[in-house]
């Protein structure tokens, strides 16, 4: 049965996005800590930030896979549903089932757009975070800390927008699951 598979994949994609949001939130304080450290402590912050970046990158790959799974299962579910509607001989049942299919497909499309939009915003933030990590790696000194401070506002803003997008995607998944179960 494809219905439980779709529900499970949507739930897993929602959980993955929530975890990803937390990872981005965790990376931000580490960036902010940079201005308060000197010398050897700077390398520790770099290593923590690098780990955060790598975690975020791995999670992005997992989210891509989850979205692909959701898309495939949804396509299979909708194709099966349409095929079964064509097998119905009762016109009233057929009409009702088509309406239900259309509503479910519309809710799924809203969910899918939200997931893809949130995922699309991850790469630019990851790229910026990677730039930051590499710059820090190559300039492990007090001068690097001073020049990175100017980027702080932009990175903080990018992460805030990304977290909001992920939260909207999670809300769309919750709404889809609630309607899907009804």
Residue ranges and their predicted role:
Residues 116, 120-182:
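Long amphipathic all-alpha helical oligomerization modules
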Residues 11, 15-18, 22, 54, ...:
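Heptad-repeat alpha-helical rod positions in long coiled-coil/spectrin-like domains
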Residues 26, 30, 65, 79-82, ...:
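Compositionally biased, intrinsically disordered terminal targeting/sorting segments
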Residues 66-146:
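Extended amphipathic alpha-helical interaction segments
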Residues 43-50, 94-102, 146-153:
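Short, charged, amphipathic alpha-helical segments
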Residues 1-56:
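Immediate post-signal-peptide N-terminus of mature secreted/exported proteins
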Residues 16, 20-30, 73, 77, ...:
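Amphipathic, well-ordered alpha-helical segments in soluble domains
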């Amino acid at each position: 049965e494809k219905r439980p598979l779709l529900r499970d994949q949507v739930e897993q994609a929602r959980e993955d996005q929530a975890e990803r949001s937390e990872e981005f939130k965790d990376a931000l304080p580490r960036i902010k800590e940079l201005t308060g450290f000197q010398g050897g402590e700077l390398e520790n912050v770099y290593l923590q930030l690098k780990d955060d970046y790598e975690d975020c990158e791995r999670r992005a790959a997992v989210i891509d896979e989850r979205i692909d799974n959701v898309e495939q299962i949804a396509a299979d579910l909708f194709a099966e549903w349409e095929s079964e509607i064509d097998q119905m001989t009762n016109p009233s049942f057929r009409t009702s089932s088509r309406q239900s299919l259309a509503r479910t497909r519309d809710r799924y499309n809203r969910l899918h757009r939200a997931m893809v939009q949130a995922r699309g915003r991850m790469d630019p933030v990851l790229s910026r975070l990677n730039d930051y990590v590499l710059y820090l790696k190559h300039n492990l000194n007090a001068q690097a800390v001073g020049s990175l401070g100017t980027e702080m506002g932009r990175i903080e803003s990018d992460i805030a927008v990304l977290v909001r997008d992920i939260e909207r995607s999670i809300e769309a998944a919750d709404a889809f699951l609630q309607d899907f179960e009804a």
